[in-house]
Amino acid sequence: MALALCLQALCSLGGWLSLYVSFCRLNKHRSYEWNCRLVTFTHGILSIGLSAYIGFIDGPWPFTHPGSPNTPLQVHVLCLTLGYFIFDLGWCIYFRSEGPLMLAHHTLSILGIIVALVLGESGTEVNAVLFGSEITNPLLQIRWFLRETGHYHSFTGDVVDFLFVALFTGVRIGVGACLLFCEMVSPTPKWFVKVGGVAMYVVSWCFMFSIWRFAWRKSIKKYHTWRSRWSEERQLRLNGHLKTH
């Protein structure tokens, strides 16, 4: 069983590495980070779809059955995601592209997945955490691509930012709090699994503070821009009215 899990994780790692190399060859004029973010975007879409299917259709429901035995589909998805996080953590360390908070998030994710796979249980809530963590990931990558291509300061960029902040606050913080509560009050999950859940939620709040600061600064900037434009238009209307007299 352990050998099969290791092989699945290694195959996943090899798959993500191969996808990254393929993107690098197809997009030779782009940076390494561009191609890595394409891999991240692909993983985000794939993991959202798979984890949503597990949580909402295949089951079991994470809010009522935390600590339950892993299903075969959960194991496959966790191995797929484990390979990705190992790839991305190695990439971030090699290129020194991320700070301690993101590295801590990836490390906790890897440890959480490994624990669930080794125990053979708690895949239900780990899968739910995966869904909550990845649901904003595609938006984050789209935002980066918009900035790189010079299209960020537009209506599309504003929509992406709004959806990102709203989803992060509502799902990762709001729904995440409910999931953590269910995890803590349930007698089934192991105590160290609960500690890992608390650690992941603390990391989410650290991200949340940074996101709220960004949202506040952008809102203030947008407000001042609107006020300035409104004042200029008002002045032009007044000047035009005076000239007619």
From Swiss-Prot:
PROSITE patterns: TLC. Pfam families: TRAM_LAG1_CLN8. It is found in: Membrane. It is a multi-pass membrane protein. Its main location: membrane. Keywords: Membrane, Transmembrane, Transmembrane helix. The keyword Nucleotide-binding does not apply. GO terms for cellular component: membrane. Residues 29-204 form the TLC domain. The chain crosses the membrane at residues 1-21, 38-58, 75-95, 99-119, 162-182, 191-211. Belongs to the TLCD5 family. PANTHER family: TLC DOMAIN-CONTAINING PROTEIN 5 (PTHR31898:SF1), TRANSMEMBRANE PROTEIN 136 (PTHR31898). This is TLC domain-containing protein 5. The lineage of its organism: Eukaryota, Metazoa, Chordata, Craniata, Vertebrata. The gene is TLCD5.
